[in-house]
Amino acid sequence: MVTPKQIDFSSCGGGDNSDDTLSHRESPRNPSSKRAAASFAAEAGEETMKKKKKKKKKNLGPPLIVRIWNEEDELSILKGLVDYRAKTGFNPKIDWDAFYSFLGSSIVAKFSKEQVLSKIRKLKRRFHVHWEKISEGNDPKFTRSSDSEAFGFSSMIWGQGEFGNDDGMDKEMVKEHDVNGNGAAENGTARIAQENESGEEMLKEHEETLNENGAEEIRDNDETARKAQQLESESEEEMLKEHEEPFNENGAENIRDNNGTTQIAQQSESESEEMLKEHEEVANTELVNENGAAKTTENGTTGGKERHDDDDDDELCAVQDAFEAVMSQGLSGYQKKLQLEKLMNLGTGKRRELSDEWKALCVEERRLNIKKLRFSAKLAEAANDS
């Protein structure tokens, strides 16, 4: 039977060597702890960098916007524009250099011409927004006490919501931008914030002129055409009434001279008929000869037919305009087409009746809008004075 031997691990060299070996074994190496310490230091450094970046971002922040216009300045601009337009006879083209000089020293000393024009553009856009809300039956929700007064003055300048006249503001802004390079203006005082406009916005301005009766003439293509036709028909009727004076039994026509005296000129029946025909030609009325046929003009065209066609076109346009303004809302495209075709095929009498009634309603609506604008301006002034 084999007996196991015990192996002696002790060194043969003596006790000193044995102690060195044991001490060496009792202090093993630990490289993982060094790596952990290095990674911890790296993470701490990254967190420190992130905190520094966040502090820098907080310190930068958005730039402060300093308000350089106040409510009184805006009202002064609008009042000045109303007074200037009244002084220049409501000229559609505004001389902005002259207007800037027209403003008081309180505005000229604080703001440059470009800043004034930029503020007018913003006031105009603000008025457009309020006007659209009012037209839709919504409350404009004026947030400042001066907003109602500013709206009253703005309505006197750009009222009625029909914009399209060129007042030369775009060209003036482009010219100022070319002169100053980046659009900045200097008038001797430091400007904290420059109000710059971005994009290519097409400014449209509604200029209104008052005629002798106080009625407003709206310079819009369709409205101008309708009003011109209406004025033309009224002038034709007045001309006929002036010239178709009654004749006495002897065929004498009563003619009043400039001094108010009446002179009687004897004329034959044929001469009086010729005069009536001449006046009818001036009034563009239908010419009818003795046989009832339409009288032809020199170039061979029939004057009565042309006049009839013009009347038909005018009536059709009026009926179509009334349909689009009153009935077309809420209808689909197919429904609009069917309804419009039926209206276009109406009889002459019915179509003329609808056309005349719609024109009368348009005139009444314009007069009512004028009264509303004047009342709003008076109301704003009364509120400001009190």
Swiss-Prot record:
Region (Non-canonical leucine-zipper): 354-375
Segments of this protein annotated with the region Disordered: 1-58, 197-314
Record-linked InterPro entries: GEBP, GeBP-like_DBD
Tissue spec. comment: Expressed in the apical meristem and young leaf primordia. Detected in the vascular tissues of cotyledons and leaves, in hydathodes and at the base of flowers and siliques, but not in roots.
GO cellular component, one term: nucleus
Keyword Coiled coil listed: yes
Chief location bin: nucleus
Biased amino acid composition, Polar residues: 257-267
Keywords, ordered alphabetically: Coiled coil, Nucleus, Transcription, Transcription regulation
GO biological-process terms attached to the record: regulation of DNA-templated transcription
Gene Ontology molecular-function annotations: transcription cis-regulatory region binding
UniProt keyword annotation of Transcription regulation present: yes
Biased composition (Low complexity): 291-300
Annotated Basic and acidic residues bias: 216-226
Compartments reported by the entry: Nucleus
Coiled coil: 221-285
PANTHER family on file: BNAANNG10740D PROTEIN-RELATED, GLABROUS1 ENHANCER-BINDING PROTEIN-RELATED
Entry function: Probable transcription factor. May play redundant roles with GEBP and GPL2 in cytokinin responses by regulating the transcript levels of type-A ARR response genes. Involved in stress responses. Plays a repressive role in cell expansion by counteracting the positive role of CPR5 in this process, but does not regulate cell proliferation or endoreduplication.
Family listed: Belongs to the GeBP family.
Assembly notes: Homo- and heterodimers. Interacts with GEBP, GPL2 and GPL3. Interacts with GEBP.
Protein name in the entry: GLABROUS1 enhancer-binding protein-like 1
Highest classification ranks of the organism: Eukaryota, Viridiplantae, Streptophyta, Embryophyta, Tracheophyta
